[in-house]
Amino acid sequence: MAYEKAEWRPVTGLGKQVASGEIKSIDQVLESGRPIKEPEIVDMFLPDLEDEVLDIAMMQRMTDSGRRVQFRAVVIVGNRNGYIGFGQGKDVQVGDAIKKAITKAKMNLVKVRRGCGSWECGCAVLHSIPMQVEGTAGSVRVTLKPAPQGIGLVTGDISKKVLELAGIKDAWTFARGQTRTTINFAKATFNALKETNMIRTGRSE
């Protein structure tokens, strides 16, 4: 989903280092451990980033002036090659809620460590994940397990979209809890992918 972009004038130290060329890759940004507070940092290094709206919900609450309606958008961004972000945004306009969610997803970007952790396969292709990982959100717990090439993504539609944008092609997925809650199912899958960075193996990226 494309939106018109204004000229970027970085205001954070990290943003200024990126704009000046001192930081030369998104990996350097992520490895610095510093929070990404400007989405343009991600745009600079990942111009091919895709976004997908997973859910839009109408939310109502009572205020002193009466009933107020807002929309909540849940969005993921990814380049189908090892990077994924998750975000949600709220606004009285659907389009603005989506824009806010995309911005937050970019600022929550993580690198996914891919590999072939399946004993049934053992190839050196980065088609799956290097080991079993788990992620939780609310009542939902998602377990991702490496799968051999050709199995595909054995999971529900929401989790599948997250894995696809992250660049995972084969994986077994097991989920518990209220998986019909889109936001928690998506976030639990995202959190599981974040865990791939906790362990490094010789056949992963």
From Swiss-Prot:
<feature type="domain" description="S5 DRBM">
    <location>
        <begin position="49"/>
        <end position="112"/>
    </location>
</feature>
<dbReference type="GO" id="GO:0015935">
    <property type="term" value="C:small ribosomal subunit"/>
</dbReference>
<dbReference type="InterPro" id="IPR013810">
    <property type="entry name" value="Ribosomal_uS5_N"/>
</dbReference>
<dbReference type="InterPro" id="IPR047866">
    <property type="entry name" value="Ribosomal_uS5_arc"/>
</dbReference>
<protein>
    <recommendedName>
        <fullName>Small ribosomal subunit protein uS5</fullName>
    </recommendedName>
</protein>
<dbReference type="InterPro" id="IPR014721">
    <property type="entry name" value="Ribsml_uS5_D2-typ_fold_subgr"/>
</dbReference>
<keyword id="KW-0689">Ribosomal protein</keyword>
<dbReference type="Pfam" id="PF03719">
    <property type="entry name" value="Ribosomal_S5_C"/>
</dbReference>
<dbReference type="InterPro" id="IPR005711">
    <property type="entry name" value="Ribosomal_uS5_euk/arc"/>
</dbReference>
<dbReference type="InterPro" id="IPR005324">
    <property type="entry name" value="Ribosomal_uS5_C"/>
</dbReference>
<dbReference type="InterPro" id="IPR018192">
    <property type="entry name" value="Ribosomal_uS5_N_CS"/>
</dbReference>
<comment type="function">
    <text>With S4 and S12 plays an important role in translational accuracy.</text>
</comment>
<keyword id="KW-0699">rRNA-binding</keyword>
<comment type="subunit">
    <text>Part of the 30S ribosomal subunit. Contacts protein S4.</text>
</comment>
<dbReference type="GO" id="GO:0006412">
    <property type="term" value="P:translation"/>
</dbReference>
<dbReference type="InterPro" id="IPR020568">
    <property type="entry name" value="Ribosomal_Su5_D2-typ_SF"/>
</dbReference>
<dbReference type="Pfam" id="PF00333">
    <property type="entry name" value="Ribosomal_S5"/>
</dbReference>
<keyword id="KW-0694">RNA-binding</keyword>
<dbReference type="GO" id="GO:0019843">
    <property type="term" value="F:rRNA binding"/>
</dbReference>
<dbReference type="InterPro" id="IPR000851">
    <property type="entry name" value="Ribosomal_uS5"/>
</dbReference>
<dbReference type="GO" id="GO:0003735">
    <property type="term" value="F:structural constituent of ribosome"/>
</dbReference>
<comment type="similarity">
    <text>Belongs to the universal ribosomal protein uS5 family.</text>
</comment>
<keyword id="KW-0687">Ribonucleoprotein</keyword>
